[in-house]
């Protein structure tokens, strides 16, 4: 094996590790979201409020990171970031709504279909190519989603449809992220814009129905 092949393999292994860690963190975030929404003895916090708090926490967390990195969160294309943030926020809200109606494992498994939608959108709108094996893998993956969504034959149950809609929105968000990445902005700017604009877009819907959390709910809410 050549040195170049070894370096490529190392990069691939790091990418797999990062993806595994990210998947674990997202699963933990989802579990905490469902916990604070359905646990008896706590305030009845809705999906919109949980989504707003998550985006707001992300924005606040990134501020000192931007300061340390000396990066100004500025872009010449705010409308493109707003489009991406809108689909992302819709996907998160819908996923949290799905948690309230179907088991967490089912909703999370259905959510993993978002890369299928991303691949389709990337081929249609971003000029990317997908070989036969990828299309075959996507078809098999979506068949698994259908099986999870309706194990009793009832695929059109409300919770599963909400989770599929969430996966579609998140797939659009990832495709839009690839789109905005071509604008030349730094990764920190893209990350900050996603959280900040997500909070701004959800705020008008979350604040009017705000429920003050119990003290123990603040940490998982963030």
Spans of features found by a protein language model:
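Structural motif at transmembrane-helix junctions in multi-pass transporters
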Residues: 38-49, 94-111, 184-188
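Loop-to-transmembrane-helix transition segments
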Residues: 14-22, 70-94, 158-166, 212-222
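C-terminal transmembrane-helix exit sites in multi-pass transporters
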Residues: 97-100, 114-136
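Transmembrane alpha-helices of multi-pass small-molecule transport proteins
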Residues: 43-90, 169-173, 193-208
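Hydrophobic/small/kink-forming positions within alpha-helical transmembrane segments
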Residues: 23-31, 56, 63, 85-93, ...
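Glycine-/small-residue-enriched transmembrane alpha-helix faces in small-molecule transporters
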Residues: 1-48, 154-179
């Amino acid at each position: 094996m050549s040195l170049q092949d070894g370096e490529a393999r190392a990069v691939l292994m790091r990418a797999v590790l990062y993806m595994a860690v990210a998947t674990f963190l997202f699963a933990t975030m989802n579990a905490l979201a469902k916990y604070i929404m359905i646990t008896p003895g706590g305030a009845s916090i809705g999906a919109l409020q949980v989504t707003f708090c998550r985006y707001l926490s992300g924005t606040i967390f990134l501020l000192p990171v931007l300061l340390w990195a000396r990066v100004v969160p500025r872009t010449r294309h705010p409308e493109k970031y707003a489009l991406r943030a809108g689909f992302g926020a819709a996907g998160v809200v819908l996923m949290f709504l799905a948690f309230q109606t179907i088991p967490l494992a089912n909703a999370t498994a259905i959510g993993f279909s978002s890369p299928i939608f991303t691949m389709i959108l990337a081929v249609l709108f971003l000029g990317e190519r997908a070989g036969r094996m990828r299309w075959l893998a996507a078809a098999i993956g979506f068949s698994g989603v259908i099986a999870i969504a309706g194990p009793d034959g009832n695929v059109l149950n409300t919770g599963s449809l909400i989770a599929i809609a969430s996966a579609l929105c998140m797939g659009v968000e990832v495709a839009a992220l690839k789109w905005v990445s071509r604008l030349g902005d730094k990764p920190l700017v893209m990350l900050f814009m996603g959280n900040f604009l997500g909070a701004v877009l959800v705020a008008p819907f979350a604040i009017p129905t705000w429920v003050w959390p119990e003290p123990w709910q603040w940490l998982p809410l963030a």
